């Protein structure tokens, strides 16, 4: 399991990093690229899991105690470009650029997916 943001989302972290996304922090590409390279061709796809909390983001305790409010989950399987498992992120600048572009597109789609999920939840309440 890899969390590309590297940390939990908070409004303060979102402001500090000037994230271009509405619901996400900026992804950190290096760890994901390193993992794919280390695992070689063992992975052909990844599961992209988006979680939205229409009633507000719960604390860890609220999650653990079953008081998280509504939780929406969207899961999709995405193919991993085969060459992403064979290039060295730290030394190959062209690959690093391609990988950043791919992850940025994925994050833009993910941010829109969360926006759609929250809008859908709001429409159900209205």
Give the location of each predicted region.
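A cross-family acyltransferase "interaction/gating" segment
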Residues: 1-88
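Accessory terminal regions of nucleic-acid processing enzymes
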Residues: 86-126
